UniProtKB/Swiss-Prot annotation:
This is Small ribosomal subunit protein uS12. It comes from Pelotomaculum thermopropionicum (strain DSM 13744 / JCM 10971 / SI). The modification 3-methylthioaspartic acid is found at residue 89. Residues 104-124 are annotated as: Disordered. Belongs to the universal ribosomal protein uS12 family. With S4 and S5 plays an important role in translational accuracy. Interacts with and stabilizes bases of the 16S rRNA that are involved in tRNA selection in the A site and with the mRNA backbone. Located at the interface of the 30S and 50S subunits, it traverses the body of the 30S subunit contacting proteins on the other side and probably holding the rRNA structure together. The combined cluster of proteins S8, S12 and S17 appears to hold together the shoulder and platform of the 30S subunit.
Length: 124
């Protein structure tokens, strides 16, 4: 326990917060090019074929990003927008692709939670 004089001289050291999405370099989103689009299986209690893409960002870092929603139009060389946000049951997947931005089309026939999947409001 430091004395008051020691605190006046040195002060308290602030703990450095570790970023959850370091490849974005403090940016909210980054643009990137898909280098590989594939499916992978989740961790133990779950079972599925999750759609993921390996993306080279504009800062040169290559990350694995999750493609949300049902169905997608992404292939190699597609230009995508990447945001932070991990997928709990896919180890090493710490980023999401933004649907409805750049080359990534929005999800078809989606009526609820449309803003998260880049879907326009349906005509009546």
């Amino acid at each position: 326990m430091p004395t008051i004089s020691q605190l006046i001289r040195k002060g308290r050291e602030e703990a450095v917060k570790k970023s959850a999405a370091p490849a974005l370099k403090e940016c909210p989103q980054k643009r990137g090019v898909c280098t590989r689009v594939y499916t992978t299986t989740p961790k133990k209690p779950n079972s599925a074929l999750r759609k993921v893409a390996r993306v080279r960002l504009t800062n040169g870092i290559e990350v694995t990003s999750y493609i949300p929603g049902i169905g997608h139009n992404l292939q190699e060389h597609s230009v995508v927008l990447v945001r932070g946000g991990r997928v709990k049951d896919l180890p090493g997947v710490r980023y999401h692709i933004v649907r409805g931005a750049l080359d990534s089309a929005g999800v078809q026939n989606r009526n609820r939670g449309r803003s998260k999947y880049g879907t326009k409001r349906p005509k009546k």
